Amino acid sequence: MKTFVAKPETVKRDWYVVDAEGKTLGRLASEIASRLRGKHKAEYTPHVDAGDYIIVINAEKVAVTGNKAKDKVYYRHSEFPGGLKSITFEKLIDRKPEMVLELAVKGMLPRGPLGRAMYRKLKVYAGAEHNHVAQQPQVLDI
């Protein structure tokens, strides 16, 4: 018996919608990353993008435990000398609530072209509305 290897053109991708309200950030992000990779499917192949499309709503209502709201800091650098910027979780969730979940999921995906292709299938919205009704997404309880 030969080992099954999925081909990119034969992979069937579904659309799912996830409500992030009250969910813990890391637990939610790890499940979303796993689904974006396609690890929940029997035909999972590491070098093929077999994951589904994930729409996340209510990203502004995601929860963190402990004092992480005040203590968790996100860093970025402008590549200029002295260009290190930082922002706390509290400020980032107020300014760009989608970015918190996007950064958490992106850090759990592989680096390189395949990881970027997986990341493009993630759609995050701060509120309860999304504009992917035409794709008829199924509700996914995580």
Swiss-Prot record:
Pfam name, any one: Ribosomal_L13
GO biological process: negative regulation of translation; translation
Gene3D superfamilies: Ribosomal protein L13 (3.90.1180.10)
Gene Ontology annotations for the cellular component aspect, listed alphabetically: cytosolic large ribosomal subunit
PROSITE patterns associated with the record: RIBOSOMAL_L13
Family to which the UniProt record says this protein belongs: Belongs to the universal ribosomal protein uL13 family.
HAMAP family: Ribosomal_uL13 (MF_01366)
Subunit structure: Part of the 50S ribosomal subunit.
Protein name: Large ribosomal subunit protein uL13
Species per Swiss-Prot/TrEMBL record: Vibrio parahaemolyticus serotype O3:K6 (strain RIMD 2210633)
Gene that this polypeptide is encoded by: rplM
